[in-house]
């Protein structure tokens, strides 16, 4: 099965040892536009296995970008590059963001990646896209600019030792801008005032479509970190009810995939089933469902949940939208890999 992975035929998704360089070469270098679930796994293994060789990571991921047209893979490459948070990766992301012919999901992720890397030089890059014709890119760049300005606010001092400044800022990024609980660089930097807000106030901000998007994002991540029934239900509700911003709903889906709370199941399935929803939201929902279904919980209740997730992902692995269909295959691969099982998709 090549190209669009949701055409006819069947495939068996099953465990394959991926923690080696041969797997990475097989699926990111030798394979083009097929076996998307293995390509995605190879992408994350590449980041880990070559973590001490950034030049090789750049070579492999650049090759993958140049030789694959899957929006899902290209988008995820941009995400991984941003999370690596190395200034050597700036040029790759700038090229993606500059390309107005590139899919907006990829451009969105490139802008987020530039903010995650945090270089002060990225501020002027991001400013150029604040009036982009794509609302998803505009909104992402607004958030990215806010994040970059916060991360670099100490870089404007007149100290003569610029290298020392850069090292201090880099350490601050590592210490303050990475989620300790989820080990990710979030797309917004929290303000201290947000720490004192009550749950009700955060939920109000989350649902208020009239406030700046950054404020809603701050509420989103604060509620994620609480990991309570109330906070997860609030996130699930806004995933379904929000009408203002696709990138916001996509981030809600991503966060629910991090939280791995069973209360999110009905909201995620409802969102995936909504074929009128933006593809970037449904794609993220499919991945979140895969994560939720890959837990090793030995209870009948969870087995029922897992069965429903597998059935749903199988159904939408044939979705008319390629990025959604591929994301469902990747979600199924999460389950197959983590639980060492085989899943047949007809």
Curated annotation (Swiss-Prot):
GO terms for molecular function: deoxyhypusine monooxygenase activity; iron ion binding. It is an enzyme of class 1 (oxidoreductase). Fe cation 2 binds at residues 108-109, 250. SMART domains: EZ_HEAT. Disulfide bonds: none annotated. The keyword rRNA-binding does not apply. Keywords: Hypusine biosynthesis, Iron, Metal-binding, Monooxygenase, Oxidoreductase, Repeat. Pathway: Protein modification; eIF5A hypusination. Fe cation 1 binds at residues 75, 283-284. Its EC number is 1.14.99.29. Binds 2 Fe(2+) ions per subunit. Inhibited by the drug zileuton in vitro. HAMAP family: Deoxyhypusine_hydroxylase. Catalyzes the hydroxylation of the N(6)-(4-aminobutyl)-L-lysine intermediate produced by deoxyhypusine synthase/DHPS on a critical lysine of the eukaryotic translation initiation factor 5A/eIF-5A. This is the second step of the post-translational modification of that lysine into an unusual amino acid residue named hypusine. Hypusination is unique to mature eIF-5A factor and is essential for its function. This is Deoxyhypusine hydroxylase. The gene is dohh.
């Amino acid at each position: 099965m090549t190209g669009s992975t949701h055409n006819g035929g069947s495939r068996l998704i099953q465990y394959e040892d991926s923690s080696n360089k041969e797997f990475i070469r097989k699926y990111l270098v030798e394979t083009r536009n097929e076996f998307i679930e293995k390509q995605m796994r190879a992408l994350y293994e590449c980041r880990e296995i070559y973590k001490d060789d950034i030049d090789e990571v750049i070579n492999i991921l650049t090759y993958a970008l140049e030789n694959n047209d899957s929006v899902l893979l290209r988008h995820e490459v941009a995400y991984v590059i941003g999370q690596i948070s190395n200034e050597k990766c700036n040029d790759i992301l700038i090229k993606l963001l500059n390309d107005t012919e590139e899919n907006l999901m990829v451009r969105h992720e490139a802008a987020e990646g530039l903010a995650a890397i945090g270089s002060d030089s990225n501020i002027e890059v991001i400013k150029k896209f604040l009036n982009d014709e794509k609302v998803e890119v505009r909104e992402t760049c607004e958030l990215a600019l806010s994040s970059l300005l916060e991360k670099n606010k100490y870089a404007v001092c007149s100290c003569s030792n610029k290298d020392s400044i850069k090292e201090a800022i880099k350490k601050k990024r590592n210490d303050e801008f990475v989620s300790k609980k989820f080990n990710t660089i979030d797309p917004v930097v929290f303000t201290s005032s947000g720490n004192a807000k009550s749950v009700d106030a955060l939920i109000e901000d989350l649902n208020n479509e009239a406030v700046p998007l950054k404020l809603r994002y701050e509420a989103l991540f604060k509620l994620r970190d609480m990991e309570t029934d109330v906070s997860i239900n609030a996130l699930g509700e806004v995933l379904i009810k929000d009408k203002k911003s696709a990138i916001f709903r996509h981030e809600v889906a991503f966060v629910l995939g991090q939280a791995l709370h069973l209360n999110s199941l009905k909201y995620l399935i409802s969102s995936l089933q909504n074929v009128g929803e933006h593809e970037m939201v449904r794609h993220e929902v499919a991945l979140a469902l895969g994560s939720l279904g890959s837990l090793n919980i030995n209870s009948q209740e969870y087995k029922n949940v897992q069965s429903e997730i597998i059935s749903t992902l199988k159904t939408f692995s044939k979705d008319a939208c390629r990025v959604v269909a591929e994301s469902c295959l990747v979600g199924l691969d999460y389950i197959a890999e983590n639980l060492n099982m085989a899943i047949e998709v007809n």
